[in-house]
Amino acid sequence: MFKSLYKETEGFRLVSILTPLCMIGEVVMEMIIPKLMSSIIDDGVTAGNLSHIYRIGGWMIVAAAFGLLFGVLGGVFGARASTGYARNLRRSMYRNIQTFSFANIDKYSTAGLVTRMTTDVTNIQNAYQMILRMAIRAPSSMVIAMIMAFTINARLASIYLVAVIILGGCLVLIMSRASNYFSAAFKKYDDLNESVQENVSAIRVVKAYVREDYESEKFKKASGNVQDLLLRAEKVLSFNSPLMMATVYTCILLISWLGARMIVLSGATSFTTGELMSMLTYCTNILTSLMMLSMVFIMISMSAASAKRVAEVLEEESTLSNGENPVMEVKNGAVRFDHVCFRYKADGRDVLSDINLNIRSGETIGIIGGTGSAKTSLVQLLPRLYDTTAGHVYIGGVDVRDYDLKILRNSVAMVLQKNELFSGTIAENLRWGNKDATDAEIEEACKQACADEFIERFPDKYNTHIDQGGTNVSGGQKQRLCIARALLKEPRILILDDSTSAVDTGTDAKIRKSFAEKIPGTTVFIIAQRISSVENADHVIVLDNGRISGYGTPAEMLATNPIYQEVYNSQTKGSGDFDEKGGDNNG
């Protein structure tokens, strides 16, 4: 963990070193001042020596000025180091997340990753700045003040030593207890963020079903869990300040009483008034340093859980990787599944079992099955969004695990069930498929996807701005734009995962006809609930609970497969889309 976190200090190590050095310089200047003050009182005021007062007073001003300079520089360097460190952490986390497979994403959840990149990194940033400044300043101040106090009077200085040992032990107990609560609280932050994210992204559904009160209670519960744990931590930490103040005042009283007795009994020969003033100042410095150190421990205990969570993301390796000599070209779209089994979790059940398929390049394959029959799981194995649990998937005669991952995914285009558009113009969204696509190529792809029909009606046409998530276009328009974006990749394999469900049957037919005419060499997989979407496919795969129930032409399936027959009959009689009884939502 420490190695991965230390690596992110690169570029800011010099200021990270200069910050504590400046803090030490500030402490040295502060520790000189009480000694000079003692000299002014004993050798200047008591002796009536004005020249000594002016001379030592001048040195005090110089020491104070240098202390101020070191303090300001330490603050500037510390801020630069901590903000730069946080920037490096977020950048490296984001870069590593981009390499994650779907399995890695499933492990952390989107809300969890957001929390780690925001709240957790901010905690680490604050702790890093405090460590660079206070974690060096406080011990340095305490040690130097202790040494100076012992040079004045070892008997009185021993009071400080006892107080430091007692307080140190109490701090360890307080911090260890509070750290456990903070660790649990940050885990609950994931649930809180997930609740917010889910509610905001589905706000239309929430309002449509009048579920505002339910969602408010759900958020209240998640927020209450975080509050409860943080409150417990704060209750433990609340002992810190009273304990510190009680110790400070006790030490001041003891030193004042014992010091006054020594001055009176010795006649100010073995112990002077100036030395007593210095001892009281050093007492305050020592115990204030200990208080600052306790604040550092509090911040460390808060950030320790965050540091662990951030390090997990930094050290996480994608479950997918290239081989030693990856294949750099996908020759064609021929697909073969060889005894493929797949499960999402190592200890879970198989969602795909013993899948065997042999599909020629350029064929159009329809996939039919009820919810939970693993239709989506099947096609996600083609671009290696997941790896098989057992068996092999071949594209162009080569195992998908032998391809360079980027080359493979550039050869497979997917239009997912949940279509995503990004804020920007229509043209900018479409160029996700091919960043170098010309205007003519964009227009041609839109014609194939029947998207040109509505784009031409917009005043700004292809420069029309799309809101985040595509909220200013309809579901059918969004689907057609996503299909056009996929076509711009000129893929060997095109996967349409229920991607025409929001368009009318006439437009659906036009899109399929365009595929047959414009991209005859591309292997097309069409996952659909509507029989009309797959009736012209070369072959149809019928899935039932992760197993192939039937495979053949649409006519053969209609004649021999009960599931296909039920879908066909339910729709031709006007019953709407068929949804076979299923289990988990893997379809």
Where are these regions (language model features)?
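ABC-type nucleotide-binding domain
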Residues: 328-587
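Helix-loop-helix
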Residues: 49-53, 144, 148-162, 169, ...
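Transmembrane helix-loop-helix hairpins at lipid-water interfaces of multipass membrane proteins
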Residues: 10, 16-73, 77, 150-155, ...
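Short intracellular "coupling" helices and adjacent cytoplasmic loop segments at the cytosolic face
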Residues: 47-48, 83, 91-115, 119-121, ...
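Transmembrane helices of ABC transporter permease
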Residues: 11, 15-28, 39, 129-185, ...
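An intracellular "coupling" helix at the cytosolic face of ABC transporter transmembrane type-1 domains
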Residues: 11-13, 99-103, 119-132, 136, ...
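Juxtamembrane helix-loop junctions of ABC transporter transmembrane domains
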Residues: 21-22, 29-42, 63-110, 114, ...
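A short amphipathic helical element positioned immediately N-terminal to and/or at the very start
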Residues: 1-11, 113
